[in-house]
Amino acid sequence: MIKDPFARLGLDREVLTVSQLNGRARVLLEDVFSSIWVEGEISNLSRPASGHVYFTLKDSGAQVRCALFRQSAARVRQALKDGLQVKVRGKVSLFEGRGDYQLILDTVEPAGDGALRLAFDALKAKLSDEGLFSADRKVALPLHPQRIGIISSPTGAVIRDIISVFRRRAPRVELTLIPTAVQGREAINQIVRALKLADARGFDALILARGGGSLEDLWCFNEEAVARAIDACVTPIVSAVGHETDVSISDFVADVRAPTPSAAAELLAPDSSDLHRRVDNLHRRLVSRMQDRLMRERLRLEGISRRLRHPGERLRQQSQRLDDLDMRLRRAFEQSMHKKQVRLAHMESRLTAQHPGRTLAFLRQRLDALAERLPRAIREQIKVRKLQLQSQMQTLNVVSPLATLGRGYSILLDERGHAIRNAAQTQPGQRLTARLGEGELQVRVEDNHLTPVTLSLLD
């Protein structure tokens, strides 16, 4: 047990000098905080010529000075910089001359999003050097796709938003969901398999979509395996991962990046009303150009007529030519008008066929079919979850600490209930508790061997 260096203060009115106070404080801090882990953000980083590294570790409410001496700094693999979130290990010490305490560090590791951001930047640079982000690899999206594959979670707002956009803008487009997990380690292989399956089914385009989340939540879309699977697809892919401010490796590799899943759907959903307006505009432009052509020919004929010197046979020939041109122009105009009218009628019939009432009836039939399948799917899922739970319970029983104790091992606890991991944590004569598979023993430390002791396995 650590002896309190201030135990006598207040009893016999011992008066300390400032140096004595700081010296005792340093001993106390180094004994109590001899090896601790602390997490925070680096700021005020400096690297003097000595090779040591000094910085301030802070969070939203406090800060502490840190020193990483040259030998320890050489073991740090990550490039340290201001703003990096890190986990550090070291001891608390006090600089007696100023009375300031600081952390003397031996280990620095990136923490949280800091580590993920380093991995993101490294993979981005690697794939960029390989040319996976090059514009030459991008495939243009089809103007009027008829079959679209959606790679996303089957539940949640994302798939509902995409379906809503297509129902409003292009209800006749066939949508197929290739379900996959979109978060966690298992999502990586599922997304890769879904991309390969969708690419082989001959869709006009694919949407890879997921809602917003933290960098860790979206991390499966920053995996190299997913990026290479996207690059290997022949089918054009729109990446719609997260919110507008979220950027993933998938966005760089895909043919087009959409800020949201709804925006991805709008990129691929042709607007029926817009098509109707375009047909009307083309019709007006055609009529205007035909009228301009007819006017130019008439003016040309009038000019020729004025240049005629003898009205005889030449006049009759020009008159016949004019009649012929007039007939040809009228016939061409009528044919063109007929074609446009037929096309317009066809477009009107298509618009009629896409009436919301028909779509609603189709969706009601689909809803009824899904309602019949839902109870059976729920029962199957419950059965699978029960089997998984039983398997996990068996695994927990195998790795349980109590099972380890049951095989003859024990755990030594000090008087505060802390586990003893090495002999340096004990003192001769110290009372310890040995927890066994069944019951406990009170033991006393006779001696502590601070050097490793080799145990013979043959005795």
From Swiss-Prot:
What are the subcellular locations of this protein?
Answer: Cytoplasm
Catalytic activity, EC: 3.1.11.6
Query: Which pairs of positions does the record mark as disulfide bonds?
Result: none
Q: Which GO terms describe its molecular function?
A: exodeoxyribonuclease VII activity; nucleic acid binding
Alphabetical list of InterPro entries matching this protein = Exonuc_VII_L, Exonuc_VII_lsu_C, OB-fold_nuc-bd_dom
What Gene3D superfamilies does the record tag this protein with?
2.40.50.1010
- One Pfam entry for this protein is tRNA_anti_2
Keyword set includes Nuclease? yes
Q: Which transformation does this protein catalyse, written as a reaction? A: Exonucleolytic cleavage in either 5'- to 3'- or 3'- to 5'-direction to yield nucleoside 5'-phosphates
Q: In which domain of life is the source organism classified?
A: Bacteria
Any one of the GO CC terms: exodeoxyribonuclease VII complex
Keywords of this entry = Cytoplasm, Exonuclease, Hydrolase, Nuclease
Q: How does it assemble?
A: Heterooligomer composed of large and small subunits.
Q: What does this protein do?
A: Bidirectionally degrades single-stranded DNA into large acid-insoluble oligonucleotides, which are then degraded further into small acid-soluble oligonucleotides.
Q: What is this protein called?
A: Exodeoxyribonuclease 7 large subunit
Q: Which gene encodes it?
A: xseA
